[in-house]
UniProtKB/Swiss-Prot annotation:
Annotated residues for binding of Ca(2+): N149, S155, G174, D176
A GO MF term: hydrolase activity, hydrolyzing O-glycosyl compounds
Record-linked InterPro entries: Glyco_hydro_13_cat_dom (IPR006047), Glyco_hydro_13_lg-like_dom (IPR004185), Glycoside_hydrolase_SF (IPR017853), Ig-like_fold (IPR013783), O16G_dom_2 (IPR045857)
GO cellular component terms, semicolon-separated: cytoplasm
Residues annotated as catalytic: D327, E356
The entry's keywords: Calcium, Carbohydrate metabolism, Cytoplasm, Glycosidase, Hydrolase, Metal-binding
Pfam families, per the entry: Alpha-amylase, Alpha-amylase_N
Organism annotation: Bacillus subtilis (strain 168)
Subunit and interaction comment: Monomer or homodimer; in equilibrium.
The protein's name: Intracellular maltogenic amylase
Listed GO biological process terms: carbohydrate metabolic process
């Protein structure tokens, strides 16, 4: 047994409160090392005849990567206090693993109380909690300038005819909020129930990430009453809306920055920014990346903090928005985000806080900052396997597992899963315009825990390279839309919503990772219900024998996509590039 590979970190995603009473425990071992692990636990104050009263239960192996196995236990301490350790067993020995590391497994070790990990008290206030509605939300991301032109009188004077060319960086086409209002029937029919808008506040650019005034709607998009109408109509349809907050930086045309440019170190706003010297030049202040027109805000400054918090609360109080997506969230200090979380959650307890973070987001997902991050690290291995074909099926599965093991279960359940956005190549382009691959990838992503999002136009086959080509105008002429893709997305979204509880909370198990033939199978299970997925990314037909799946004969099996009943002895062909979803459940 390789002792150095055994890892458990208390007070982390390895040991946390799931719901204010239940504690989730994980431990990692070298892959294939441990035969089984026993979890030893009890109340630190409970003794019987002078001996600590301990409970023992087996742990379940829930995931594996190329190097490690992950084991899981769930306990409900009756007095909310927990003292615990692990007994790891292989072919040759039992070892005790606790706060002092690896120890011999014997009576003396078991009775040495300071060798045990502690979870002093399970506080509900310390429990990561996210809005329940997010678990049942399918998001649709809209880049407002390119979605629909509902009022030509709002369009910039230099706006080009809608969809007349592929966009350049500085082009305008006249998309606005009225265009979104006009298309709500379309969005409802598609099945999405959450709308994420990139910035809508006053700004000179088409993307609006260079904010002029956070308290006003950009005049080319509309006005407060039009936005109020949009929010009201969304809520009437049972749909949610999330806005984009750019609090890392502000636009260089903003009055605050212009005051600094004009007045230098005499400006009342000089401490709002990270300025190295005066007067301001092109290279003596911090900005987003190296973008001169996006000076970075100093969020440690109390005036800046109040300004930004007032903005966040204003749009909640005045318009009842449901969420904030936070741009460049990883470059803003944790102290500010903790204050932000407290302020907005106090104002609206079920508001959703989403951070734009392109790497592991665990430091922001501990319950006192964000509810979720844009889950690029989770979906990137899926894209690399299905679209790029640069990694194997097993490598993809291992990376997916590693990402899930790095998070708390309730955080994974509300993560923002996406395959493309305004910052990436479009999905179809990433798939080299192979629609089968795009469909398989979407079906795969929609089968995972988390809140799925599609980027506007994906459902009708819109393609596009990186920015600005990923920000094309939406196509509204039906004859120019891919209607087969549209019907596919409607069915995929409907299936996700139908099986939402299972796909959000259910256990993921990989059944088959055939790297040679590019054939994958995994299952999602919750209670007595199971969905079994098969993806054939190879070049030959694969056959699935239902008899060999050993499904309980009391359960009814059907093709979850077509809802066609199946028999336990059926054999189903999965064509190259296609997928199969089986549903098995006890008869109602």
């Amino acid at each position: 047994m390789e002792y150095a590979a055994i890892h458990h970190q208390p007070f982390s995603t390895d040991a946390y409160s799931y719901d204010g009473r239940t504690v989730h425990i994980k431990i990692r071992t070298k892959k294939g090392d441990a035969d089984h692990i026993r979890f030893i636990w009890g109340d630190p104050y409970e003794y019987n005849d002078g001996k600590w009263s301990a409970n023992e239960q087996p742990m379940r192996k829930i995931a594996a990567t190329e190097m490690h196995d992950y084991w899981f236990a769930e306990v409900v301490p009756p007095f909310r206090r927990l003292q615990y350790a692990f007994v790891v067993t292989d072919d040759h020995e039992d070892i005790f693993f606790g706060s002092s590391g690896v120890c011999p497994y014997n009576e003396k070790t078991l009775e040495t109380i300071h060798y045990y990990f502690k979870f002093p008290f399970v506080h509900e206030a310390d429990t990561f909690q996210a809005p329940e509605w997010v678990k049942s939300t399918v998001w649709y991301q809209i880049f407002p300038e390119r979605f629909a032109n509902g009022r030509e009188d709002l369009s910039p004077k230099n706006a080009l005819p809608w969809g007349s060319k592929d966009p350049d960086v500085n082009d305008f086409f006249g998309g606005d909020l009225q265009g979104i209002v006009d298309k709500l029937d379309y969005l409802e029919d598609l099945g999405v129930n959450g709308i994420y808008l990139t910035p809508i506040f006053s700004a000179p650019s088409n993307h609006k990430y260079d904010t002029l005034d956070y308290f006003s709607i950009d005049p080319h998009f509309g006005d407060p009453e039009l936005f109020r109408t949009l929010v009201s109509q969304l809520h009437q349809r049972g749909m949610r809306i999330m806005l984009d907050a750019v609090f890392n930086h502000i636009g260089s045309a903003s009055p605050q920055w212009q005051d600094v440019v004009k007045n230098g170190d005499q400006s009342r706003y000089k401490d709002w920014f990270h300025i190295h010297s005066f007067p301001v030049t092109d290279d003596n202040y911090d900005r987003f990346a190296f973008t001169a027109d996006m000076p970075k805000l100093n969020t440690a400054n109390p005036e800046v903090q109040k300004y930004l918090l007032d903005i966040a609360l204003y749009w909640i109080r005045e318009f009842d928005i449901d969420g904030w997506r936070l741009d460049v969230a990883n470059e803003v200090d944790h102290v500010f985000w903790k204050t932000f979380r407290q302020a907005v959650s106090t104002e609206k307890p079920d508001v959703y806080i989403l951070g734009e973070i392109w790497h592991s987001a665990e430091p922001w997902l501990r319950g006192d900052e964000f509810h979720a991050a844009m889950n690029y690290p989770f979906t990137e291995p899926m894209i690399e396997y299905f679209a790029d074909q640069t990694i194997s099926a097993s490598r993809m599965a291992h990376r997916v597992n590693a990402h899930l093991m790095n998070g708390m279960k309730q955080a994974n359940e509300v993560m923002f899963n996406l395959l493309d956005s305004h910052d990436t190549k479009r999905l179809l382009t990433r798939c080299r315009n192979d629609e089968k691959k795009a469909r398989a990838l979407l079906a795969f992503m929609f089968a995972q825990t988390g809140s799925p999002c599609i980027y506007y136009g994906t459902e009708i086959g819109l393609n596009g390279e990186n920015d600005p080509l990923c920000r094309k105008c939406m196509v509204w002429e039906k004859e120019k839309q891919n209607q087969d893709m549209l019907q596919f997305m409607k069915r995929l979204i409907a299936l996700r919503k139908q099986e939402n509880t299972l796909l959000t909370e259910g256990h993921l198990e990989w059944n088959l990772l055939d790297d040679k033939n590019d054939f994958i199978s995994f299952s999602r299970t919750l209670d007595e219900k199971i969905l079994i997925y098969f993806f054939n990314q190879g070049n030959v037909v694969q056959h699935v024998s239902l008899r060999e799946l050993n499904i309980d004969r009391n359960k009814k099996i059907c093709d979850a996509w077509t809802e066609q009943p199946l028999q336990h002895h059926d054999v189903i062909a999965v064509q190259p590039g296609e997928f199969l979803i089986l549903s098995a459940a006890a008869p109602v």
